[in-house]
Amino acid sequence: MRGRHPQVTRAARRRGRPLAAQADRYALYQKSVQSPDFDIALMNRIYRAHNGRPPLLLREDFCGAAALACAWAGSRRDRRAYGIDLDPEPLAWGALHNWQGLPEEARRRVQLVQGDVRTVRTPRADLIAAHNFSFFIFRERDQLRDYFRSARRQLAEGGLLVLDVLGGSDTQTEDREEVRRIGGGVRYVWEQKRYDPINNRALFAIHFAFKDGSLMKDAFTYDWRMWTVPELRELLAEAGFAFSEVYWEDAEAGTGEGSGVFRRRERAGAEACWMAVIAAGTRPPAR
């Protein structure tokens, strides 16, 4: 599928500034990738199963534009959130577009912090979320273990660290693209640029293709180590977590696509592409 979407067609040039040059990459990312309400519902279900009460304080690590942190504060009047990210650009965008969009009372319950998630200290949280495979940026075991240890210290008693994980044979290929429409004449393009099986390291990119033929190329790029579920659970145990459990996404019958339904599982079948959520807790589960 390479070369299918030219960056700017002649027709787009004739009409003036191409749509790709006018678009906001963060707005497109949130529209195509993030589902804060879904994430909140899933984390709430998992936390309540372990603690018998709703979680109130969320820390969103690697928060980017803090869509989850802001949605969290907006979901209940007694909820607070911290969003932590090293990059000032998405934080500034999130402050303008997500934080400012909250009612004044809710804005007081959200704090956005620029800093390294391994060193920023916040009040102990009921939940720490590291979503969108953000912790895959740590490519060495010691680095990732250090992050898990710091997260463990930032959790309240009974707190949970919630991670999402991506894998399967389809993620271990090169020159592969997935295209889907996200509305407004825009197509989301996920490209797998490179995969190194010796280091289990992969390079991905998100592009956005527009109806005028223009392309926002490399809107976001990711250089990740593709951590496996057993590796992550071992590192969580080494970091001091009392337990971890896996919530596996069911596949749709017939298509094999993700259904959005996550169930706690001990085993799973070989799927070409899968997503899962790992929840790690500070104390052994009651069940």
Located regions from the model:
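Conserved class I S-adenosyl-L-methionine
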Residues: 54-64
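C-terminal lobe and adjacent flexible extensions of AdoMet/dcAdoMet transferase-like proteins
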Residues: 223-287
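A short glycine-rich, Lys/Arg-flanked "PGG" loop and its adjoining helix->strand segment in the class I
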Residues: 143-157
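Conserved SAM-binding loop
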Residues: 94-95
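SAM-dependent methyltransferase
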Residues: 162-235
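A short acidic, Gly/Pro-enriched loop at the edge of an enzyme's catalytic core
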Residues: 118-128
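Conserved SAM-binding loop of SAM-dependent methyltransferases across substrates and taxa
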Residues: 65-78
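Conserved SAM-binding strand-loop segment of SAM-dependent methyltransferases
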Residues: 102-117
